From Swiss-Prot:
Similarity-based family: Belongs to the kynurenine formamidase family.
The protein's name in its UniProt record: Kynurenine formamidase
Subunit structure: Homodimer.
Catalytic activity reported: N-formyl-L-kynurenine + H2O = L-kynurenine + formate + H(+)
GN (gene name): BNA7
Species of the source: Meyerozyma guilliermondii (strain ATCC 6260 / CBS 566 / DSM 6381 / JCM 1539 / NBRC 10279 / NRRL Y-324) (Yeast)
GO biological process: 'de novo' NAD biosynthetic process from L-tryptophan; L-tryptophan catabolic process to kynurenine; positive regulation of cell growth
Domain notes: The main chain amide nitrogen atoms of the second glycine and its adjacent residue in the HGGXW motif define the oxyanion hole, and stabilize the oxyanion that forms during the nucleophilic attack by the catalytic serine during substrate cleavage.
Alphabetized InterPro entries for the sequence: AB_hydrolase_fold (IPR029058), BD-FAE-like_dom (IPR049492), GDXG_lipolytic_enzyme (IPR050300), KFase_ver/fungi-typ (IPR027519)
Pathway the protein contributes to: Amino-acid degradation; L-tryptophan degradation via kynurenine pathway; L-kynurenine from L-tryptophan: step 2/2
Amino acid sequence: MSSSKLLKYGSDDLQTIRVYRHDSGNHLSIIFIHGGAWRDPRNTFNDFEELVGKLPSTINTFGINYRLSPAVKHPAHLEDVVSAIEYLAKNYKVENVGLVGHSVGATLALQILNYKTILPGLERPLGIKMKFLVFLDGIYDVPKLVEEYPTYSSFVNEAFKTKQDYMRATPVSSEMPQFDISVEKCVILLVQSTEDELLSVQQTELMADFLQAKSIPFEKHLGAFGAHEQVYRHHKVAKLITDAIGANLDGLVRARPQN
């Protein structure tokens, strides 16, 4: 998209944000978080270009890049995502937000909900209201991932210093306090392709069980959405996100004060 531009939220070359579309008159923003096993430089905010083109122009759209392993370890990836969101909240007045995360981007989206617990000493609010969360073929329980796919320990060990660190990485694998960001009235979508060659449905089922145990409403969508790196390009996934956008825009319009 030729109209997009890049922003820096830190000194590292990877601490960048792609602004796909921004209009101060828009009331809803989507922030995309890419996957790539915390380490693959081939996965970037550019992954979502095709998806953005299928979404309504009445929303702001941003993509986040973050530092990769093994150069950095957990929780540096989350620190970067938090910093990027804070940058957008401060400089672009982003308030009503939907997060879309793919693979470990979904992990990071989940971690955002407990960012104060995972990042000790960070007590300040992010300045956003979470309107919807879309988890695409995500990783939610790292210990269970390694148990199911022992060879995946290679990239997990690059991203985390110790086993204890990745056991405590998300609220699904470790008991954590209530979320630091409210998900009340937040639309939550769990999306999993049955054609994913890298992740079985187990991670999505673990996440669904977690949300059910917390009595948090969600929608689960299993379908033939393509291979792991095709899910976020699939037209049916774009439709699911568009529907979540529509529900939120309707609510925001109704909530606007009348002149």
